[in-house]
Structures are given as C-alpha cells and as structure tokens.
Amino acid sequence: MLIHLKPEEIIAAAHHAAVRQSAKAVRTELGQIKNHKISNQSDFAVNYAGLLGEYAVARSINAKVDTALMIAGDGGTDMVLNGNTIQVKTNMMPENVLIFNQLEHFNTDWAILCSIESASSVAIHGFISKGKFAKTYHRHDWGYGNRYCVKAEALAPIEKFYEAIGLT
C-alpha cells in the first residue's frame, strides 16, 4: 500500500524528528545516554524517516502516532490500537526487510514494515506478530553483526491488520 503523506504530516514528522534529535544530543553530551546508532545517516534523518513511516501507518490503520519524548527512546512502541502495541520499522535499504538488531527488541504485539518511496510517499509492506516473527526470522549480517530479519514477502498485507487484531 502506498501512502501519499499530507503536508501537515510531513511537517509534523520533521518537527518531532528535530525535537527528538535535539533532546538526544543534549542527553548524550551530558553523558545521560549513549548513542547506539549504527547508521551512517544523522540522528535527524533516522528519526525523520521513522516518523514518516509512523504517520503513514497511523493514517492507514486509523491510529495515533506517539510523539511523547522519552529519556532513552520509546522502548519500541510507536502506537497502540485497541490495546495492541505496534512498532513501525521504516527501512531505507534497497531490499524490503523487517529488521531487529536483537530478537528481544521486538517487544510489541505487532511490527509493521515501511519504506520511503519519495519525499512524500511511504510504502507499507505489511505486518507480522511477535510470535510469527520468532518462528520465521532468518539472520543476516550487513557488516555490523547478525540481525534478525523477515522479508517483506512473508508479511501479511496491511489491509488485513484490523482482522488480525479483532476489529472486523
């Protein structure tokens, strides 16, 4: 599913990415947290891409993006719908793969994979439950250690998400 973001969603994503990046920079400088980023992109770019994915998913499933500022990240939960916790993973790699650095980092009920297609378009590739991910993942090393992965083709289409969480 391709979502064309509205200007106000793009602006909100940029705003919240800047707030998160600024807070993280201050806390890192004060020694309160450690930056665990492995990407060669800036913290702002990583947060911005993630928030674009979150806004696309929120619109597609009629949920609200959690923009609360947490001391050391959101713990994985990007939104909650009908009591179900959801983590949105926005992949910026050429191949569409849902990736967790560690298996225990999948600590929500569901994960949804997105990719940035253009400055205002986000593709939602599908979703998977925590249990199914644990049974179907494969490991892959992109040069910085093994990661836990499921290819987009193995995900359920986002159009079936309401059915999966019992809302239909």
What do these predicted ranges mean?
Residues 1-82, 89-168:
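Nucleic-acid endonuclease domains
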